[in-house]
Amino acid sequence: MYLAKMTTAQAKEAFEKDPIIVIPVGSTEQHGTQGALGTDFMVPSYLADHVEDVDNVIVAPTVPYGVCPYHLSFEGSINIGYEGLYMVLHGIMDSLMQHGETVL
């Protein structure tokens, strides 16, 4: 199940079953002249597509940012740094844990 497609009531019901939460993460960064900037987050999103219908699994929205300071000389690359990525993931996990989640 995709968290983003649920209503609040559906999420509450799903969270009561103590599901496994999958959080796809990947950078937006260059992959040469032939590769898409979103490759690093499209792959985990694709893999998440294959587990979203597994019983008791919830797929959280993909985090399309990461740490890539070495790619900043290439147009389109987005670096949020180690602290930024930590803060984003910590915020997501803290929010889910407020709803009783334990397996992330």
List the model feature ranges, each with a label.
Residues 38-53:
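Short catalytic helix/loop segments, enriched in acidic residues and glycine
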Residues 12-16, 52, 97:
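Solvent-exposed alpha-helices and their adjacent loops that cap or buttress functional pockets
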Residues 23-24, 59-63, 103-104:
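Short beta-strand segments at enzyme active-site cores
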Residues 1-6, 69-104:
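Active-site histidine-anchored catalytic micro-motif
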Residues 34-41, 72-76:
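Glycine-rich loop at the start of a catalytic domain that most often binds anionic cofactors/ligands
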Residues 19, 54-57:
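A generic structural signal for alpha->beta connector loops
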Residues 1-36:
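Active-site and ligand/interface coordination hotspots across diverse enzymes
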Residues 57-72:
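Short connector loops at secondary-structure junctions
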